[in-house]
Amino acid sequence: MKKFFKTLLVTLLLIPTCAWADNGWNDAEYQRIEQSIQLPNIKQATMKYVISAYGAKQNASAAQNQKAINKLIALVSKKGGGTVVIPKGTWRTGAIEMKSFVELNLEEGAVLQFAFEPKLYPLVRTAWEGLACWNYSPCIYAYKVSDIAITGRGTIDGGGNNDTWWQWNGNPHFGYKEGVTKEHQKMGSRARLQKMAEDGVPFDERKFGMGQGLRPQLVNFVRSERILIKDVKMINSPFWVMHPLLCKDITVDGVTVWNEGPNGDGCDPEACENVLIQNCIFHTGDDCIAIKSGRNNDGRLWNKPSKNIIIRNCRMEDGHGGVVIGSEISGGCENVYAENCEMDSPHLERILRIKTNNCRGGLIQNIHMRKVTVGQCKEAVLKINLDYEPREACYRGFEPTVRNVSMEDVTCQKSNYGVLIIGGNKVENVYDIHVKNCKFDGVIKQPTKVTGKTRNVKFDNLIINGSLVLNKEDRPYQTYSEWLTHSEMQRVPQSYLLDFSKKPKWSYVMGIEMEGMLDTYLHYKGGKSTFKGADAEANNEAIINYLKEYPAKMIDEKGNITGYKYEDFNLDNVRTAKFILRMHNLFPSKSSELALKTLFKQLQNQPRTKEGVYWHKAIYANQVWLDGIFMGLPFYCNYAVQNLKPKKAKKILDDAVDQIVKTDLRTYDEKTQLWKHAWDETHSQFWANKEDGKSQHTWARALGWYVMAMTECLDAMPEDYARRGEIITLLNKAMKSVVKYQDKKTGVWYDVMDVKDPRNYLESTASSMFAYVLLKGYRKGYLGKEYQEAGIKAYEGILNNFIKVNPDKTISLTRCCAVSGLGPGPGPYVKKPNYKRDGSFNYYMSEPIRDNDAKGVGPFIWASLEMEMQGLNK
């Protein structure tokens, strides 16, 4: 007994894994379905009866030909079966009714032309949009028959156009004219039929047809079995094209559907079993293939799911959806397999769609698609929505269930969404959805969007826009600050080789990125890390150990800095001092202390303009760059406050405020309300405006440096420092303009802010800087609530447009401008001028774009920390 319970326990523990493994494509079931589908057994199929020999004529009226063809079909069926042949030519007719054991064969060049004469379409038992009724006979109709076929290379033309059937839908786009179109859906027939069904009105009392405006299908077989439709072309259907209803054993093979009319579904098996649709071409005004099982109360009463359906080797062009389940799906649907199809059109809206609502109810399960190639679709590759027709008049509370849906080996080149799932609000009834080994490029709006109540929506090797899509529970970290920090550590195991360095490098980019990492370490120390591994605290400690490597490698015991030259007076080389200062505060050392003194000394002796603002570098004599304000002043302020007496420190702070304010006066452009990249005091540089000395354009990252400098200087300034307000006022002025230039669609910013040009691009480093300042500025009380909202929008835009998950589950910040600058032009310290860097738009566009540039990694980490500290990353 103990052994039995032990075995049972092991079995139960294995159930979730085994169940999930069985939930995808099932080859054995596929083969079982394929082998179970029966073709029609048409006795005496070789006996051919040509309609022209039995009274049909090309110059006869539609009524005359209708009578002749129907009489012949009945005769052939009565004789035990055979083939009724439509020879080459155009044959006008009214509704045709198929009988058992009859094949209707259209020879190549034959056109069966259905006339727009409503009286030729008598009332028959059918269903209209999933509701049982008496309505106009479909063009080709059958009821309770077996072993029938429509074959041949000819054409079945339903006669639909804007002057005939299509105008009945009540839409002016399809020819409807108020007061002119006599019969149409706007007369209320559709709503009346829906109410009859909801109220349980008996079928025989639901009589429509003449004068009611409910258009007939092109082909509709009801309660029939063993059906073949092969090779024909079907065009211009009044309504749905092929509509087998409550049928069994249906094969649709090699059919071409061209129907751009309203509700022009290509093939709609409804409450059918054992269906094969293969080698077909669909170009439709609605869904290409839509599997159905009755609408609302009628579907529940039929209680017959559509099941055991194979779709393969088809091409879908225009249409609302390629393969669709619903929306008339109250009876449920199960065991659908679609494979080896091609779909491509800017008007094809979805590839696989399941649509239903809580009027329907029903169980939709075991829906599988694989090996489908998509050029483009308009909305989503996979869409499941349980909110279809939210204003439908019906009795609600019948919650549908969608489960066990898989998509595998599907590629798409362009869409708005990759996966779009809209679950219900009350019941968790969308679950076990698996997208595996798929690649969707050119996704414009959002890679995946899942709303409502869902469970076990799994993405396995799903690549969207080059980024691996992970379920939240599969992410190694639940915060982006930690995730990108550890991703960089994994990519670059030695901190002194960050930013694509081949050898140890002293550079401002190192300091920016590593300071972001330091803030991540400090925020998540003490057991707060979201790392999914065994020892989260040790994982967090790895950050600080990584950061310690840099000063240990770059600064010797005498305080000498590898690669640093004092005489260059390069402000870029000072920026990393702020990181070293913070590390020194945590881990004091004599070497760091000496190095910091050297770097502060540089700032004390840095050449300046006549107005007292730092030159950017010796080779950039007499030039003020927005970049330089960030490179020098935050360390300048922090070091002074920490190491100088209050009076001397205040003098330093006053100097910093003066430089920030004077830079505003010299670089601000009233026309654009933006700040130019740089200013030349002499107005003589080749890139400078000869009248005011400004460069031509606003480079977004330069402005990002400038506003980050303001926030960091404010961090260093004591609360009672009198001139803080000047910086806060200027920060508000700058961020107001930044938000004005925020791209409304994406929430991020273009590389060159003052140019509208197709070559301009959305750029990640500046966008990260602006997001960081907006969010931090709000948290610190410098900026109002509207700026936090702009920051959230920006951060979400960065995630949607720039963050990529790599196959190894690291993340990357993409679309980073590698570098941009100005000159240098000829000067006393310049060895070789660089005339390419002329500040023109063409120049900015010529610089390379790359992933994981440290100038963006650091600000993105900071922006992420702001989201996390403010509880906005939920």
Features from the language model and the residues they span:
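Extracellular beta-rich repeat passengers
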Residues: I329, H347-K472
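Short glycine/acidic-rich loop motifs that flank beta-strands on beta-rich extracellular proteins
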Residues: G81, T93-A95, A115-E117, Y136-S137, ...
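Extracellular "leader-to-stem" segments immediately downstream of a signal peptide or signal-anchor
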Residues: K2-T7, L12-L13, C18-E103, E107-R223, ...
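Long, well-ordered core segments of solenoidal/helical folds
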Residues: T479-L497, E537-T562, L594-V613, L653-W679, ...
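Oxyanion-binding "anion nests"
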Residues: V707-D754
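Right-handed parallel beta-helix
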Residues: E108-G109, S146-G154, E225-I235, K248-N259, ...
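Asp-box/WD-like beta-propeller blade repeats and closely related beta-sheet repeat scaffolds
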Residues: N162-G179, S592-M631
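CBM-like carbohydrate-recognition segments
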Residues: K449, E473-L484, E488-G511, T520-G526, ...
